[in-house]
């Protein structure tokens, strides 16, 4: 049995991954430490886990929910997962559900971003139950 701590990387612009490297700040995201975590892709491929890599969540575009193709360019996720794993010894199962430029009202009604987020979370929980993964 595998155990993960599930993190829902959700929210607005600060979580949506608009990071870029430039000549002034050329350092990119770190590589994932072996065993530190995995990504569950609830939208693009909910059949398996993927190694966490930047840009995190770039393929998780739901045309009826959170949809921002080609907008995610890098995030804090890999760095956070590495640090969390180094401090706890517990790998992270990451789930992307962020939408840059959104207002809180977009997260509060029927058929909104929160509804999409809850659906993604339930999909991850079901996958874990079916694959003997403890959260």
Predicted segments — roles?
Residues 1-135:
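Cell-envelope and extracellular/periplasmic
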